[in-house]
Curated annotation (Swiss-Prot):
GO terms for cellular component: cytoplasm; nucleus. This is Exportin-T. Gene3D superfamilies: Leucine-rich Repeat Variant. One of its GO terms (biological process) is tRNA processing. Transmembrane segments: none annotated. Pfam families: Exportin-T (PF19282), Xpo1 (PF08389). The gene is PSD. It is found in: Nucleus; Cytoplasm. InterPro entries: ARM-like, ARM-type_fold, Exportin-1/Importin-b-like, Exportin-T_C, XPOT. Probable tRNA nucleus export receptor which regulates tRNA processing and facilitates tRNA translocation across the nuclear pore complex. Is required for proper activity of the shoot apical meristem (SAM) and correct leaf initiation at different developmental stages, and may play a role in floral patterning.
Length: 988
């Protein structure tokens, strides 16, 4: 070995070679690459070196040089490289016994040689090296080595240039078109003939070579004349290969790949259909029943599915009755095998089962009636869906415990099933009776298997039923159309195997909930429904996830059945006694509880039932007491324990108090205001006593946010439930909620005040008179008069809280103003905050980026003007307010803010704001009369450079009664004024 060869070998070394030595070797190789004579060096090494590392390095270097420097190479150098690598590929060995043969090297070296030739073809064919393919074919008689090399060159050309499976540059696309056009004219027929001859000659003696040639041919079918391969010579040969048991699977599979390429070739459907007919594809149907893991079964499966797709496409695109009949016959012929492939075999990744089946089902939609064969196909499609949606048993334990693996598999299957369920519902619309019978039979088969090992089958059958229900109309569900009247009773009265598994239990309960419309109409099944939820299939299920989900679904069922459950109250409470006891005593801090699974829905469900007026008053009182008493006791005990709890135990005690409050809140949702205040005040008294207990939580732990928010939620609830009877509790409640409130807590506090104002209107005046000054001082201490930035961007969490507080303040002020409570702003305690409030509302009405907020502020001004300003020339109710409105609001908001280019008239929200601004101007004229008009004419309009005549026209419009005309004129005025300011328009 010379120095270069040694350096190349070291640079490829991956073992324990010194890193410094390897780096030195790589550097040396790179230096050699840069020498002007590098092509000669590489060619010489390729002829004489037998080291595969050296051969590969030289070929790679040649390819790099050609790609980067071809245009700058001399003609002699180009010719030298061309002749040399072509001679190597064609086995033209120089007369030297020490010469190496690159084409007899390992595959990676031969592939690299093929890539070098493909690169030369890229630059030189057909203008410089027009005979490359014809010259190469003259050497094919030398046997397998050259034939193999020829195929590798064609494959490299496909990979590097022609195939559209890879992204191509515009230049590459242009070169590919040039190469293909030249090959079609010059040599493709000869190449196709060579493929045929080689495969015919070597199919038995060298199956690997035959498979290589067939794979090469497959790549070219998409762009050569189809007649060169789809003819009386090639097609029989290919099917002979596919059907020959004595041949290797590799050859048979490669032949199937060629037929698939013919089938998939882009063609006019008028030409494609006869081709598909002549193939007589039924000859290979039996091959898919072999070993599903074999390469041949995989290739034939891909052929059949590809064939079916093309037949279906022809059926869609051809319009004549004859061609449609032919295509449907072909489709009917191949479909049973396609269904078999879908159910038993590994489907090719390029084939979309759902897309194909949806396409087929769509061809059946317009038919007046389905034939027997089509109905059979529908059943087979449903079986495909059932098999596809089955979980893999290997994940059974993971899915039951819902560990990380189980969660990932459930998420994956949930996504995977979406399209399959779309297909199911589509089939259900085309053939509802067949679909229902299939689901019934699937359920029956699942039930017959008493083995727990049938979990996946049972879950799949129940999932089919659940998904099918999504497309049913309410009327069909109520009446139990088709065999639904048989399916639902079967669902309710059957003990399904595998019910202990989480997946089966969940989908079973989801099904009952989905088909509740049927049960509402058939109340004889209510005991079965209750049994499913109350026994070990639901709330008493051994799996925590099931029992919690059952609580939520039970609540939904109760909401639908309501009064029909009154006769079963005792049974329900008796069955839930242990569950309720567990919920009120368990350590909730040790559980990760979220949303609908936190157990509170059981209390909501019970509240809905016992809150009905159909329940006798005495019993209702007993039931409520039975539930409220232990929950209140839990809160009282928790308060005592939390006071003395260690830092570790404190969160646990707080969590238990928190859940008890949530449960009480949920329980109260079943009781309405009329019941608890008018017809059964004793119930109202119990809720008042409960409210007393909960308010003590605020006294004991005012700064524990979870407790504070839950108590606030309960107060919200009691406002709706107790109505005005809640008034005596409000001062104490509001005082506690207001104490030491942070901005975030103030937001929640104002939400409560908004509810109270909307509920009680002016009746809340006295309470609001006391509360508003405290709210105002808190807020105006942290929010400046000109407001906070309205777009948070990259701001701190603290700033976000302040922005949210400011936003809620606008809502709060708007609610006060629009519920006839604006006098609250004028009380002695509140008067000090009037100016900062007005400045903030003014600034916001002009500048806030949120148009809806600006509109609310304009509406505040409108209401205050109406409330605080009498008719023209009367004494002012709020000294200085009129001047402030005319000079600040009318000018800055109603004129300047509208003139700003950001005020976009084409935006719907902005247009609504503009309407409010027009209303404000109209109200100002009604209240201030000529004083307002004079200010517009003498100050506002001149400052905006509005011509006198246009200003006068606007004032005339303002004094009229046509507000729509006023709005249109003012918009036109503003738009013209903007143009004038741009210097592109002058008023005349």
């Amino acid at each position: 070995m010379d120095d270069l060869e040694q350096a190349i070998v070291i640079s490829f070394e991956t073992g324990a070679v010194d890193s410094a030595l390897k780096s030195q070797a790589v550097t040396y190789c790179q230096q050699i690459k840069e020498t002007p004579s590098i092509c000669s060096i590489c060619i010489e090494k390729l002829w004489f070196s037998k080291l595969v590392q050296v051969q590969f390095w030289c070929l790679q270097t040649l390819q790099d040089v050609l790609r980067v420097k071809y245009g700058s190479m001399s003609l002699d150098e180009q010719s030298y490289v061309r002749k040399s690598v072509f001679s190597m590929a064609c086995l033209e060995v120089i007369d030297n016994e020490n010469a190496g043969r690159v084409v007899e090297g390992p595959p990676f070296v031969k592939n690299k040689l093929a890539q070098v030739l493909a690169t030369l073809i890229y630059y030189e064919y057909p203008l410089i090296w027009s005979s490359v393919f014809l010259d190469f074919m003259l050497h094919l008689c030398k046997g397998a080595v050259v034939i193999d090399m020829f195929c590798r060159v064609l494959n490299a050309l496909d990979d590097e240039l022609i195939s559209l499976d890879y992204p191509r540059t515009p230049e590459e696309i242009s070169v590919a078109a040039r190469v293909k056009d030249a090959m079609r004219q010059q040599c493709v027929p000869q190449i196709a003939r060579a493929w045929y001859d080689i495969v015919s000659m070597y199919k038995n003696s060298d199956p690997d070579l035959s498979a290589t040639v067939l794979d090469c041919m497959r790549r070219f079918v998409s762009w050569i004349d189809i007649g060169l391969v789809a003819n009386d010579a090639f097609v029989p040969l290919l099917f002979e290969l596919i059907l020959s048991d004595g041949l290797s699977e590799q050859v048979r599979g490669a032949a199937a790949g060629c037929v698939l390429a013919m089938v998939s070739k882009r063609m006019d459907p008028q030409s494609k259909l006869p081709l598909l007919q002549t193939l007589q594809i039924s000859r290979v149907f039996g091959l898919v029943s072999g070993d599903v893991d074999s390469d041949l079964v995989s290739k034939v499966s891909a052929l059949l599915t590809g064939y079916a797709v093309e037949v279906l496409e022809c059926h869609k695109r051809l319009n004549s009755e004859d061609t449609k009949a032919v295509s449907m016959d072909l489709l009917n012929e191949v479909l049973p095998s396609v269904f078999y492939v879908m159910q038993k075999c590994e489907v090719d990744s390029t084939f979309s089962i759902v897309q194909f089946l949806l396409g087929y089902v769509s061809t059946l939609k317009g038919l007046p009636a389905l034939k027997e064969k089509q109905l059979l196909h529908i059943t087979q499609i449903l079986e495909v869906i059932r098999i596809q949606i089955c979980y893999d048993p290997m994940y059974r334990n993971n899915l039951n415990s819902l560990d990380k693996t189980g969660l990932e598999e459930e998420d994956r299957m949930s996504e995977f099933r979406k399209d399959l369920f779309v297909l199911l519902r589509t089939v259900g619309r085309v053939a509802p009776e067949v679909t229902q019978h299939f689901i019934r039979n699937s359920l029956a088969n699942a039930v017959e298997s008493s083995s727990e090992s049938n979990v996946e089958e049972v879950e799949a059958a129940l999932s089919l039923l659940y998904s099918f229900g999504e497309s049913m109309t309410e009327e069909a569900m109520k009446t139990g159309s088709g065999c639904l009247s048989e399916l639902i009773p079967m669902l309710l009265t059957t003990q399904f195997p595998g019910h202990s598994h989480r997946l089966v239990a969940l989908v079973y309960l989801e099904n009952i909930t989905r088909y509740m419309k049927f049960i509402q109409e058939n109340s004889q099944y209510i005991p079965n429904v209750l049994g499913a939820f109350l026994d070990d299939r639901g709330l008493h299920h051994q799996n925590f996830y099931v029992s919690r989900r059952a609580g939520y679904l039970f609540m939904r069922v109760v909401k639908l059945l309501k009064s029909k459950l009154v006769p079963f109250i005792d049974k329900i409470l008796q069955n839930l006694q242990d569950t309720l006891s567990q919920l009120t005593t368990m350590n909730f801090a040790s559980r990760e509880l979220t949303g609908t699974e936190d157990g509170s829905h059981i209390f909501e469900a019970i509240g809905i039932i016992i809150g009905l007026e159909d329940v006798p008053a005495e019993k209702q009182s007993d039931y409520l007491s039975l539930l409220l008493t232990p929950l209140c006791q839990q809160i009282e005990a928790g308060l005592v324990q939390a006071k003395v709890a260690s830092s570790e135990d404190f969160p646990v005690k707080i969590a238990n108090i928190q859940f008890a409050i949530v449960a009480i809140n949920a329980l109260s949702k079943g009781f309405n205001e009329r019941l608890v205040t008018a017809s059964r005040p004793g119930i109202g008294l119990m809720f008042k006593q409960t409210l007393d207990v909960l308010l003590r939580v605020l006294i004991e732990f005012p700064k524990v946010e979870p407790l504070r928010s839950k108590v606030t939620s309960f107060i919200h609830r009691m406002v709706d439930t107790l109505g005005s009877a809640v008034f005596p509790y409000l001062p104490k409640a509001l005082e506690q909620l207001l104490a030491d409130s942070e901005p975030k807590e103030m937001v929640g506090f104002m939400v409560l005040l908004n509810q109270l104002i909307c509920k009680f209107n002016s009746a809340l005046h006295d309470i609001l008179e006391e509360v508003y000054p405290v709210v105002a001082v808190r807020i105006f201490n942290v929010i400046p008069r000109d407001g906070l930035p309205s777009r948070p961007g990259a701001v701190t969490e603290e700033m976000r809280e302040l922005i949210e507080l400011q936003r809620m303040l606008y809502t709060f002020l708007h609610v006060i103003a629009t519920h006839d409570l604006s006098s609250v702003f004028l009380t002695p305690k509140s008067r000090a905050y009037l100016d900062p409030m007005m400045q903030l509302v003014l600034n916001t009405s002009c500048n806030h980026k949120d148009i809806t907020v600006r509109k609310a502020c304009v509406q505040i001004f409108i209401k205050l003007i109406k409330d605080w300003c009498a008719e023209p020339y009367s004494e002012e109710k709020v000294p200085g307010f009129q001047n402030f409105v005319i000079e600040a609001f009318a000018t800055n908001c109603c004129l300047y803010s509208v003139l700003d280019k950001s005020f976009n008239f084409s935006d719907a929200n902005t247009h609504a704001l503009f309407g409010e601004i027009i209303t404000a101007q109209k109200v100002m004229y009604e209240k201030f009369g000529n004083t307002f008009l004079m200010h517009l004419m003498s100050k506002s309009f001149p400052s905006a450079h509005i011509p006198q005549d246009l200003a006068e026209q606007y004032c005339q419009k303002l004094q009229g009664n046509d507000i729509r005309s006023l709005k249109s004129y003012y918009q036109s005025l503003i738009e013209n004024l903007r143009l004038q300011q741009n210097g592109s328009h002058v008023f005349r």
